[in-house]
Amino acid sequence: MTDVAEEAGWATAKTLAEALPYIQIYDRETVVIKYGGHAMGQEDVAKVFAADAVLLKLLGVHPVVVHGGGPQISRMLDKAGVKSTFVDGLRVTDEATMEVAEMVLSGAINKEIANWITLAGAEADVRGVGLSGKDARLITAEKVTRTKKDPDSNIEQAVDLGFVGEPTKVDPQLIEALLTSEHDYIPVVAPIGVSPDGDTFNINADTVAGALAGALKAKRMLMLTDIKGVLDGNGELIREMTIEQARALIDTGVATGGMIPKLENAIHAIESGVEAVVILDGRRPHAMLVELFSEYGAGTLIKR
């Protein structure tokens, strides 16, 4: 063994020893992971994510994955010649778009992520289980209503978003059964919901993750994004904040674009019983492990 290899071994042992207190903190605790962004479409990054999820399970954590798929849906709609329009960041979803969205989310992305997890955990028999909110009525949803101000009359007008929904009820029994099974299952949930009448709805994945984390009373919700976390007015990373400070970022306009719904869903999750939410860069290898098992973590921690 070379000196370099020996030093690397000692460094690995030191890292594992330093992680012990954090491993004990998360033992048998549920962590909901919102997996999305452009990193989800990169096979090498997806394999690292799957391996990290398996490692969490083997360390005693109960990971639950909720995934998005906006870019993949857009590509499929383009191929089908279906034009997309958006209101407040939500895709207007007619019947044809809903059919494509469900096919991509539940039929392609969901099963691919579950398969990567199963492959990564094959030696230890850790398995990914692909689900959508329609399974066992995991997510009951209703139609989203939005208004938009007419630029000419300055009057708020209702906007029909089609089959875009928001959760009204989350029944976590199926997820809890998988997590407490004698087998090592990792649930992977597509953000599709169903109304009491059986209508299918496309739901924002951040919203689903927050609602599910609240229903499961998760220890943490990790929101993997394409940026390093929440930034202040100077573009610097905010390491930690309260939900009051998160609201202030929204109210003062410091938080913009896609960060607004992320903060809103983080606030809602914490108010529903989640201990803390972390917004972090999912493109960085092993970001989840750094956040959960190191002193300084990664990204922005939001707590009550």
From Swiss-Prot:
It comes from the Bacteria. It holds the Pfam family AA_kinase. Keywords: Amino-acid biosynthesis, Arginine biosynthesis, ATP-binding, Cytoplasm, Kinase, Nucleotide-binding, Transferase. Its EC number is 2.7.2.8. The keyword Ribonucleoprotein does not apply. One of its GO terms (molecular function) is acetylglutamate kinase activity. Disulfide bonds: none annotated. The record marks K34, K262 as: Transition state stabilizer. GO terms for biological process: arginine biosynthetic process via ornithine; L-arginine biosynthetic process. It catalyses: N-acetyl-L-glutamate + ATP = N-acetyl-L-glutamyl 5-phosphate + ADP. Pathway: Amino-acid biosynthesis; L-arginine biosynthesis; N(2)-acetyl-L-ornithine from L-glutamate: step 2/4. PANTHER family: N-ACETYLGLUTAMATE SYNTHASE (PTHR23342), N-ACETYLGLUTAMATE SYNTHASE, MITOCHONDRIAL (PTHR23342:SF0). Belongs to the acetylglutamate kinase family. ArgB subfamily. Catalyzes the ATP-dependent phosphorylation of N-acetyl-L-glutamate. This is Acetylglutamate kinase. The gene is argB.
